[in-house]
């Protein structure tokens, strides 16, 4: 069985970073929703008006009470947090975009970066 390594970039305020999720805080991923979004992306591309909401990971990891993981579920060390945006809203779109990028690479299509809006906590 092929192991899938997911990868996608998020862009907020012209800054490109990797994706982070808060372990135990972000809701569980519903793969049915991801598949529906992915199917739409394959037909229409990513609708740029559907921005995900993010914060800079280093702004939330400093207190130590939030555990961040990357899109593959690997822990993010505090010293690496500045390479990530924590996705607050848009987990399903982000996962679908990473699967789209894998499909795009196999089909000669252009990969996408997920548009995001940075919010304040």
Question: Model segments located where?
Answer:
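Short alpha-helix boundary/capping and kink motifs at helix termini
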Residues: 1-88, 92-101, 105, 119
């Amino acid at each position: 069985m092929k192991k899938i390594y997911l990868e996608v970039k998020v862009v907020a305020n012209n800054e490109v970073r990797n994706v982070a999720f808060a372990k135990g805080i972000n809701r569980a991923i519903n793969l049915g929703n991801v598949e529906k979004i992915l199917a739409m992306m394959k037909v229409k591309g990513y609708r740029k008006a559907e921005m995900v909401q993010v914060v800079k990971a280093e702004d939330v990891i400093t207190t130590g009470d939030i555990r961040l993981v990357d899109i593959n579920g690997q822990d993010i060390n505090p010293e690496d947090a500045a390479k990530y945006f924590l996705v607050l809203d848009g987990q399903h779109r982000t996962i679908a975009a990473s699967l789209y990028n894998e499909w795009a690479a196999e089909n000669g299509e252009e990969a996408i970066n997920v548009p995001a809006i940075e919010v304040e906590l």
